[in-house]
Amino acid sequence: LGKGLGGRVKPDHGEKEKPEMKYSVFSLLKNTLSGHKKWPAAWRDPQPQKDYDVIIIGGGGHGLATAYYLAKVHGISNVAVLEKSWLGSGNVGRNTTIIRSNYMLPGNNPFYEWSMKLWEGLEQDFNFNAMVSQRGVLNLCHTDPQRDAFARRGNAMRIDGVDAELLDAERVREMYPFLDFNNARFPIKGGILQRRGGTVRHDAVAWGYARGADSRGVDIIQNCEVTGIKTVKGKVVGVQTNRGFIGCKKLGLAAAGNSSEVAAMAGLKLPIESHVLQAFVSEGLKPYIDGVVTFGAGHFYVSQSDKGGLVFGGDIDGYNSYARRGNLPMVEHVIEAGVAMIPGLARVRVLRSWGGIMDMSMDGSPI
C-alpha cells in the first residue's frame, strides 16, 4: 500500500477507541447471569469521516481481512471499509464454506497453504468462533489417468509440506459407503484426501474480522455505496458515495464480482470476467457426510452443515452477469452430477439456491 500512511495505532476519529470485550467462558457465564442483556455491540456503526489514510471498497471477507491486518500487523488504523449493503452480504456469505490447500502449481500451492495456516489459528487470533471444522476434503478419481494425476498432485503437495493421502477404492468405500461405486460410466477408482481441509462458518468469518478491525479503530461503514472515484493527475484522492465525498491517500478494491465496475470508475479496465456461481442447500438430514466430497467426473462438491442440510454446488453459469441469481439449466446440471455420485440424493428435497458473482481472471490466478 506504499509508505507515508502515518502508521497511527489509535484512531483519531473524534471518539475514543472502544474497549474490546474478550469473549471467553467467563464472559459467557457473566452475561448468562444478566440474561444476555449486557453484551456490547460487536462493532460500531460510525458516520463517515472527511478523510482516511486508507479506504477499502467492499465489506466482505477480503475487505475486512485487509483492514484487520492493516491495523493489527502494520499499525494503520485510520482506515474505512465501505460496504454498499450490510456487512457480509456478498460472496463471503454466499459460498459453500469449503477451505482447502490441495493445489499443485508452484504459484498456487504456497499461497493457499499460507491461507490454510491462517485458518488454523484464526479463531484464537481474532477471538471469535468461526466454526473452523477440519473434517477433510476428498477428491474422487474415476479413471486410471486421473488417479495418476492425483498422485502427481499429492506428491507436489507433500514436497511443499502440505498433507495429502492417496486412497484406493476400498478405503474410499469405508469412509463413504453411500457413493455409487458400481456406476458403469463413472466407477470410483479412489481419491486424494487432505485431512486438514474442511469447512468454516462463512458469516462468522466476516463478523470476526469486523469485530477485530473495529476494536483496533477501523471504521466499518455499511449502506455506503461508492458511486465514483476522484483522481487528480492520475492519483486517487477520494471516493464519491451516496453519503458524500470521502478523501483518502490509498484506495483498496475488494468488491469481488463487481471489481470491474468499480475499477472502471477510475478509468481502469480489468482483465477479468464476472460469472454467477450457484450454491444449494437441502432439507435437514441425519448425520450423513462427515467431510467434503468432490466428484471427479463432473464439477460437484458437497458437505453437510451443522443443521443437517447438504450444502453443494458445481459449475459457474457460462455467461457473463452481475446478477446474483442463476438459471435453471445449471440447477439441473449440478444436481445431475450429484445424483451420479450419490444416488440417494434423488430423494432429497432442495430447500433453496442462490448465486454469487465470481471475478474470473483468464488463467485462474489472482491479480
Question: Predicted regions: what is each one?
Answer:
Residues 241-290:
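Central helical "cap/lid" subdomain
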Residues 18-54, 69-77:
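Extreme N-terminal leader/targeting segments of oxidoreductases
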Residues 59-62, 84:
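Glycine-rich Rossmann-fold phosphate-binding loop(s) that bind the pyrophosphate
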Residues 191-250:
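Helical element adjacent to the flavin cofactor pocket in flavoenzyme catalytic cores
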Residues 110-113, 140-149, 192-211, 221, ...:
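Short beta-strand to alpha-helix junction loop
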Residues 71-92:
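Glycine-rich FAD pyrophosphate-binding loop
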Residues 96-178, 299, 329, 337-339:
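Dinucleotide-binding Rossmann-like beta1-alpha1 core, especially the glycine-rich loop
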Residues 284-367:
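Active-site lid/adjacent beta-loop-alpha segment flanking the redox-cofactor pocket in flavoenzymes
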